[in-house]
């Protein structure tokens, strides 16, 4: 029984380590750039739009909040991504800025 538990813990860790394992960060970057997401961020924070991801008062505390915020931004901009595309964008943002486990 202990061996089985150890086995399950070892093989479950990679899944737990990346909340967007099904996403492709390269595809996510293409989607992010193609939807001109950064232009809106520049309007919000000025200058470097990527500062929105690293600001000290971030409203994105975890992976779930990140995915929810991506969906919120979609509704604000009229972007219509599939769930898979949302995951790609989340994977890109997580890999580049957030680093959520």
Set out the residue ranges of the language-model regions.
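C-terminal capping alpha-helices of c-type cytochrome domains
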Residues: 79-101
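The canonical Cys-X-X-Cys-His
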Residues: 28, 34-44, 89, 93
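N-terminal export/targeting leaders of redox proteins
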Residues: 1-23, 98-101
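Sec-exported extracytoplasmic/periplasmic mature domains
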Residues: 33, 71-75, 94-98
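Electrostatic cytochrome c docking/interface patches
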Residues: 13-33, 75-78
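Short cysteine/histidine-rich metal-coordination sites, predominantly Zn2+-binding motifs
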Residues: 52-60
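Short Fe-S-cluster ligation motifs
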Residues: 64-82
């Amino acid at each position: 029984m202990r061996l089985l538990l150890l086995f399950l813990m070892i093989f479950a860790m990679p899944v737990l380590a990346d909340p967007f394992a099904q996403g492709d960060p390269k595809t996510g970057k293409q989607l992010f750039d193609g939807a001109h997401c950064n232009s809106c961020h520049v309007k919000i924070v000025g200058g470097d739009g990527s500062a929105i991801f690293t600001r000290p008062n971030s409203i994105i505390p975890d992976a779930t909040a990140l995915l929810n915020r991506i969906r919120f931004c979609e509704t604000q901009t009229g972007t219509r991504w599939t769930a898979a595309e949302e995951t790609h964008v989340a994977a890109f943002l997580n890999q580049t800025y957030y680093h959520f486990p």
